[in-house]
């Protein structure tokens, strides 16, 4: 049964291309080596964005855990875009069994935990980034290792708690997707619903209401499991599915993320950027009428519930 579940859960694509100069390697506790890249805000390639505030400040760092059928080459342009428009650094890594680490062994739940631990250790020990300035961002299957790490740092007496947790199209657990189980059974994978209850950091949930891969009911149930004081207003978007919230609704998506970062993360980090000004806010008129940037696959009309569209103090 375990191998069948893993085959369903992990479906790495053919390794995509990414310049070797952009990656470095991390050693995991299980003996595997995984590739990663680190995008520094304002220092990407030959392009330089003007700093938004004083150079004495330090950007927040997103630790990005990608979705199932992706690898580093697939997500590099998107992570660069996030860095630019959120004013953050981004560290992303591949799971063992993915991309250039495909020959390192198969992807498993336990190995994913070791992989994100290695990435986090690099941020904390090598780059010496304070935990409060690290925000975990997991999308789809990436919400599994992200919830694990957020829980581990919250429960550990030897580590500081991370600054925040962003879960994009999360699930309660793998068995709850496949079998619609109501509890964590033996052999289940990535029990996010169990981890998230222990997390002591502000949590933002993002989900399309028409998601047919992971129904929005998973996010709605997770939201109720989060400790009340750590519930950030979620972003639940009408007419959006599993893969297009961040693409078709880019303006809404970035505004909501920037509001979350400003209210819950930067306000608690005196040495971080105090108030980024995302360029997406000064969008062209065409985009306001439904125009979709080049990176998007398609456009769509939408509506957002009042609870998730406004950053009020209700949550």
Stretch-by-stretch model annotation:
Residues 58-67:
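Short beta-strand element of the alpha/beta-hydrolase
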Residues 106-128, 148, 194:
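Alpha/beta-hydrolase active-site loop
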Residues 121-126, 131-179, 198:
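Primarily recognizes the serine-hydrolase "nucleophile elbow" in alpha/beta-hydrolase
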Residues 216, 220-224, 228-315:
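C-terminal catalytic histidine-bearing segment of alpha/beta-hydrolase fold enzymes
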Residues 1-46, 271, 293-296, 300-304, ...:
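An N-terminal hydrophobic leader/cap segment in hydrolases
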Residues 198-200, 204-207, 211:
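Short beta-strand/loop motif that positions the catalytic acidic residue
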């Amino acid at each position: 049964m375990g191998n069948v579940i893993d085959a369903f859960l992990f479906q790495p694509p053919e390794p995509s291309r990414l310049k070797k100069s952009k990656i470095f390697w991390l050693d995991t506790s299980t003996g595997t080596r995984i590739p990663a890249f680190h995008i520094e805000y304002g220092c990407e390639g030959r392009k330089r964005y003007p700093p938004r505030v004083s150079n004495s400040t330090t950007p927040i760092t997103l630790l990005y855990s990608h979705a199932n059928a992706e690898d580093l080459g697939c997500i590099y342009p998107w992570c660069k875009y996030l860095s630019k428009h959120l004013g953050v650094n981004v560290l992303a890594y591949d799971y063992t069994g993915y991309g250039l680490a495909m020959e390192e062994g198969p992807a498993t739940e336990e190995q994913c935990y070791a992989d994100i631990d290695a990435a986090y250790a690099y941020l904390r020990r090598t780059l010496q980034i304070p935990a409060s300035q690290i925000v975990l961002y997991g999308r789809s299957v990436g919400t599994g290792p992200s919830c694990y790490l957020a829980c581990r740092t919250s429960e550990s007496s030897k580590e500081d708690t991370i600054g925040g947790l962003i879960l994009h199209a999360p699930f309660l657990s793998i068995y709850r997707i496949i079998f619609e189980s109501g509890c964590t059974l033996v052999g289940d994978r990535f029990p996010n619903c169990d981890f998230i209850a222990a997390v002591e950091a502000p949590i933002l949930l993002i989900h399309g209401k028409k998601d047919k891969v992971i129904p929005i009911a998973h996010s709605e149930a997770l939201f109720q499991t989060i400790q009340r004081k750590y519930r950030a207003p979620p972003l639940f978007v009408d007419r959006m599915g599993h893969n297009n919230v961040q693409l078709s609704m880019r303006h809404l998506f970035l505004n909501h993320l920037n509001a979350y970062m400003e209210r819950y993360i930067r306000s608690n980090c005196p040495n971080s950027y105090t108030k980024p000004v995302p360029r997406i806010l000064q969008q062209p008129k065409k985009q306001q009428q439904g125009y979709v940037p080049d990176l998007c696959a398609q456009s769509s009309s939408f509506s957002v519930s009042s609870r998730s569209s406004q950053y009020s103090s209700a949550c």
